[in-house]
């Protein structure tokens, strides 16, 4: 009798994706991040569901409802902090996952890569609307400042902003629609993640060498299922350390003050995972230019396959490119630091230099270095 795992219409899909899937034998822990992102998404949907049971999306009661969750709901505080810090873990995994793709040349899987970039945008949108929901000072002013950037779009900008706000300022209509978006987007992310996997399984995984691994495959289960479970346990450990020992480490103290349209906080800044893009936005002293730079800083990932001039796929055997890659990582960390600093000397200059370096490395230095490496190898 044939195994039901291989014949049942539903079980067959699961089997081909997670059990009998032929996987390269040499993929490192950098390939764990995909499954960790899946774990993060499930965790966020579950904790978010329980939070939504007690949250009210009304300007008068939103802040109080979050306080009520933390004080009066059974284990509400842990659900709230797991959700808030779970977002941080999500972005840590996301940035490392993208970094892995850049380092090992995974962007040559065009469909998988492009859907990944769309996923990145969707997750960023979800996190942004989610940050507005507690209706603290930074929620309100963050929403005001970031949505206002759309007014830089010529001709339709102002109408577009007022359409998104549902009025002439960030108010009840804005909060209600942001809650609706925050609820629906994770399910769109889940659907996109399935398409992402579908395209990945058309080609099979890349591996650290960047060389086709068809000659040496192993089944996904038990080897990589065990490996993924270990990764998930470590992720949970780090998350719970954060939640139980310093839940407010990555948050902003201003968000413990209820939103007040009459009082602007001295430094308006987004959550830490948006600071690099915020620094690029602020480094250009022109509204439209800043917005274009902000969008380009993420959208530039779409160009990666076009900018790949090396004859090798992975950076594993390319020391000069490796050097550039880690300079890029350091540059992004610098931008993250600058994004959280006030707009004054010397931070403005450092931010501008780091922004120029970011685009210079990706658009010019990496393709040129790859060509030089080709010539050094007489290719």
From Swiss-Prot:
Name the coenzymes or cofactors required.
Answer: heme b
Tell me where in or outside the cell this protein is found. Mitochondrion inner membrane
Which residues does a ubiquinone bind?
201
Tell me which GO cellular component terms the UniProt record holds: mitochondrial inner membrane; respiratory chain complex III
**Annotated SUPFAM superfamilies:** a domain/subunit of cytochrome bc1 complex (Ubiquinol-cytochrome c reductase), Transmembrane di-heme cytochromes
Q: Where are the transmembrane segments?
A: 33-53, 77-98, 113-133, 178-198, 226-246, 288-308, 320-340, 347-367
Instruction: Summarize where heme b b566 binds, as residue positions.
Output: 97, 196
Give a short account of what the protein does: Component of the ubiquinol-cytochrome c reductase complex (complex III or cytochrome b-c1 complex) that is part of the mitochondrial respiratory chain. The b-c1 complex mediates electron transfer from ubiquinol to cytochrome c. Contributes to the generation of a proton gradient across the mitochondrial membrane that is then used for ATP synthesis.
Protein's UniProt name: Cytochrome b
- Tell me which species this is from: Alces alces alces
Which gene codes for it? MT-CYB
